Amino acid sequence: MARRILIGTTNPSKIVWLKSYLADLPGIETVTLTDLGVTAPVSEEGRTPEENARIKALSYHQATGLAVVGHDSGLYFQEFSMDDPRQPGLFIRRVNGQTLDDDGMLAYYSRLAQDFGPLHACYCSGFAAVDETGRVATFAQDSVSDKDYFSTFGFLMVGKPHRMRRPGWPLDSLSQNPKTGEYWYDQEGGRNTIEESDYSRNYRQNVNRFFTNFFQNK
């Protein structure tokens, strides 16, 4: 019988992305919150993406008893200081006390980019894994102060949306390659296509290794 691992998000684009990190694990079956009918809300009160990923993974494990993978991210603009209220940080969807849907995010961030952009942006991620016993581990390598990370994974956020949309990741429609000025959707390879480098290769390998080692109990 396959081991079931729950993807701890309802974001359809993030589900596909997180599944890709588990693709090399043998004998598993990934399931979603929708598959299980789980609607339990999660209070994201962590101070970092890594802490929020841990909170999510543990909450969904407690609700289901399953092994879980969790993820959270923050969005950061170089144009704003870390204490500037316009700096999204962990609150990408939460603006002025409201939680924005995809259309609301497009409207808000396109206005922000029109007023101050194009904005030099970067996502920073944290990952977490919980097994069936409740054992938990986290991983984060991203840092907005890491010049190699920002130069590798940074992008431009612009004020004019691309015609294409991706449910769950609406800001992809505002995102451009800073080296070519192309929208992500117009690049060969799609979302945030980057030049292959030792840094980017090692980053992906480290995330894969984190999940593989954890679920194989190494």
Predicted regions and their residues:
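Anionic-ligand binding patches
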Residues: 2-6, 13-218
